[in-house]
Design a protein with these regions (language model features):
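Alpha/beta enzyme core
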Residues: 14-24, 102-113
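Conserved, mostly hydrophobic/aromatic
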Residues: 26, 63, 106, 114, ...
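Alpha-helix-loop-beta-strand connector modules within alpha/beta enzyme cores
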Residues: 39-54, 78, 82-99, 127-150
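Hydrophobic faces of well-ordered beta-strands that scaffold small-molecule active sites
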Residues: 3-9, 24-28, 54-56, 71-73, ...
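Glycine-rich phosphate-binding active-site loops on the catalytic face of alpha/beta enzymes
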Residues: 71-83, 115-128, 149-175
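Short, polar loop motifs at secondary-structure junctions
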Residues: 9-15, 57-62, 75-80, 97-102, ...
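N-terminal active-site wall of soluble small-molecule enzyme domains
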Residues: 14, 22-86
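Structural motif
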Residues: 21, 66, 109, 159-161
Length: 175
C-alpha cells in the first residue's frame, strides 16, 4: 500500500527538502510570523521544479491567488467562506480534526483528506490506535494519520486504514 506523505514546515530549507523522497508533499505552516509572499513563491517554484505538491496552511484566498496545489485548514479553522470561492478542479482542500465534531466541520468545509491527530502520544489531543480507528470510521473522507510519528512507530501505521501520514519530526530526522 502506497501512503501519501505530508511534511509540515515553518521555514524553508531547500537542501533538506531536496534530499527527501519526491512523494512527500510540503505544507507550509507558520503562525508565528506575518506571511511572506515572496518566500511562498520561492517554495512554490522549488516544489514545482522538484515535482512536489505544495499546500499553504490556513489561507485559502492566498493559496488560490498563488496557484498552489491546495490549502490545509487546521482544526481551529471552522470558516465556510471558501465554499463560495471559484476553486479549480485540481486544487485540494485538506484539514485536521481531533474529534467527531471537528470531523463534521471539515466535511462541511468540503475537504478531501482529514488529518486525524494525535495518533501517538503527544502533549495534547492524544487518541491512540483504538480511538483513532473509531474516528476514522466516522467519515467517508480519506484519512491521514498525524501526530507523534517517528522511526520507532512508523511501521504501526501500516495496520491502519489510512491514505497517508503527516509529520514534522519524522522528516526532520531524515536530515
Amino acid at each position: 500500500m502506497h501512503l501519501k506523505k505530508y511534511y509540515f514546515i515553518n521555514k524553508f530549507d531547500p537542501y533538506h527538502i531536496k534530499k527527501l523522497n519526491k512523494n512527500i508533499s510540503i505544507i507550509y505552516r507558520n503562525y508565528n510570523s506575518i506571511i511572506n509572499v515572496s518566500l511562498l513563491i520561492k517554495i512554490k517554484n522549488f516544489c514545482r521544479k522538484n515535482r512536489r505538491k505544495f499546500y499553504l496552511s490556513n489561507n485559502v484566498k492566498l493559496a488560490l491567488k498563488l496557484n498552489l496545489d491546495g490549502v490545509y485548514l487546521p482544526s481551529f479553522n471552522k470558516s465556510l467562506k471558501h465554499i463560495n470561492y471559484q476553486i479549480k478542479k485540481d486544487f485540494l482542500i485538506i484539514g485536521s480534526a481531533h474529534n467527531l465534531l471537528e470531523i463534521r466541520i471539515k466535511e462541511k468545509q468540503k475537504i478531501s483528506h482529514i488529518f486525524i491527530s494525535s495518533i501517538f502520544k503527544k502533549e495534547k489531543n492524544y487518541l491512540g490506535f483504538y480511538k483513532f480507528n473509531n474516528l476514522s470510521k466516522m467519515t467517508k473522507k480519506k484519512i491521514i494519520a498525524l501526530g507523534g510519528i517517528n522511526n520507532n512507530n512508523i511501521r504501526k501505521i501500516n495496520m491502519l486504514n489510512i491514505s497517508g501520514f503527516a509529520a514534522i519530526d519524522y522528516f526532520n530526522k531524515l536530515k
